[in-house]
């Protein structure tokens, strides 16, 4: 274990106000110390490393120039917010990042007044910032609102919708484009820095405003010529910006995001200019800046487990079974080898969804559309219209962003699009913003859609094959984050019969009906109940839609107690089963039905097993539900012969 970094200047900082009297040289020292503190903290907790390292200087400069928290700084996505948390009074808890009861890995309104807007998903900052800017203006509050957004997030349409609105509204909003996909090249040198300072100065803004007013009075032909001349001139000196200018933004940049002597003057100029209308400052940074392993392999150090600071080697437990993501990726490649019509679509997550394997094997059949879930879904619908078999691989929480397209463009038209829904259920340290707990509720209500839920990796393999062969309409398969349970995966997985579940263990008296990941908890509960003399039947529903009505009716007829268990929110599988049982009159004869699902609240970051325990869907909760239904104490001895056979 390495010793804590030496941070004499940072040790004197209790909040952003303590940075405002510092010189540029002191700000540079503070940035170095914040970077060292962040590296050390993330080496202990794991988390998002590279993006935060890339914005250390920018973070220090922003809090130095702007009067936070009265001025608002909104961090898009939030991966990069660790330096911000260190500077805003949370340094003493920075080594609790993403731990149960500790700091969130994202910005969180209830955590600090310096977090004016919560994040986790991308491309929301400009919309939120514009709302805050207009809201403040209507209230008569003179404050600055700054939205910091990465170049990756600019691939989403929402960012441009917000910019279009901001340009038309002419509200005072500062957008900082954190461009970490460019190398720092000559355009970001001394001359560019000088021009950026000039273009952001109050005097230049005044001259330019006057010039625009004069041009507006010219005849149309002369006005067009003058505007075109200005575009050419600004393009030559700034290296770009015409697009943003056309959307109504005043463009400044690009500037070196790691040079405090470049950042501070530009930020101060923009703030002091007090210009009405939005401004975009183009800042070029390097992901992983200041930590060699992260600079050399930014993709591997975006999100990290615990690691050795000196070597950069991450601590990773030896896997006991392949991950569900890996199983999906492997099976999709196998299916694609047999059917040339299979293609895949991902929204900027080829590695995270396992599609990198397909991209390597069949690069022409794998499409990464960027952070654009809405487009991804409708693009896949178009592919299906032309006879292809598209698999759209998204995290459950990100599928929410394309829900209207699922309904309107796919399901309504019965197009055979396959949805591979990764990270279904609790996701642990990423918390509420990334939890995949709503998809069963929002997909289960849609006509024409088949929804499968994998209980283990072998079931997932069969579901990939099932989806590949399903051409009569849309179909979804959902599966959790992390490793499988260790079951053997068949060499040649066979498709499932649509809408048919399975009995996993025969018993009597009590039936446990699980869907998806909760099957293992049901089996664990059986072991606990066996010590009480109970031998429950265990069934795996496999399908949310259409669920196996024959199986449910059989379980209801043969048992006194039916416990339905899902790792999903209210309105999902439990609701479907309960409604059907009631409408069929199968609850009229005294069947004791209990529904175990995720309660009606959000669950913050913690270990997945802790989240399941808190939600009341783990083995102990299932055991308790059975005993309560039978009106038995946990220590009671069961007369198994008295139960319904």
Curated annotation (Swiss-Prot):
Binding positions for thiamine diphosphate per the UniProt entry: 79, 120-122, 152-153, 180, 291, 373
Cysteine pairs bridged by disulfides in the record:
none
**So what EC number does this one have?**
2.2.1.7
Q: Which GO terms describe its molecular function?
A: 1-deoxy-D-xylulose-5-phosphate synthase activity; magnesium ion binding; thiamine pyrophosphate binding
Under which main EC class is this enzyme filed?
A: transferase
Q: Which Gene3D superfamilies match?
A: 3.40.50.920, 3.40.50.970
Cofactor(s) needed by this chain: Mg(2+); thiamine diphosphate
Keyword Kinase annotated: no
Q: Which InterPro entries match?
A: Dxylulose-5-P_synthase (IPR005477), THDP-binding (IPR029061), Transketo_C/PFOR_II (IPR009014), Transketolase-like_Pyr-bd (IPR005475), Transketolase_BS (IPR020826), Transketolase_C (IPR033248), Transketolase_CS (IPR049557)
Pathway terms, separated by semicolons: Metabolic intermediate biosynthesis; 1-deoxy-D-xylulose 5-phosphate biosynthesis; 1-deoxy-D-xylulose 5-phosphate from D-glyceraldehyde 3-phosphate and pyruvate: step 1/1
Q: Which UniProt keywords apply?
A: Isoprene biosynthesis, Magnesium, Metal-binding, Thiamine biosynthesis, Thiamine pyrophosphate, Transferase
* Domain of life, source organism: Bacteria
- Which reactions does this protein catalyse? D-glyceraldehyde 3-phosphate + pyruvate + H(+) = 1-deoxy-D-xylulose 5-phosphate + CO2
Q: Where does this protein hold Mg(2+)?
A: 151, 180
* Cofactor, how bound (note): Binds 1 Mg(2+) ion per subunit. Binds 1 thiamine pyrophosphate per subunit.
Which PANTHER family does its entry note? 1-D-DEOXYXYLULOSE 5-PHOSPHATE SYNTHASE-RELATED, 1-DEOXY-D-XYLULOSE-5-PHOSPHATE SYNTHASE, CHLOROPLASTIC
Describe the family membership recorded for this protein in Swiss-Prot or TrEMBL: Belongs to the transketolase family. DXPS subfamily.
How does the record describe its quaternary structure? Homodimer.
NCBIfam families according to UniProt: dxs, PRK05444.2-2
Q: Report what the protein is called.
A: 1-deoxy-D-xylulose-5-phosphate synthase 2
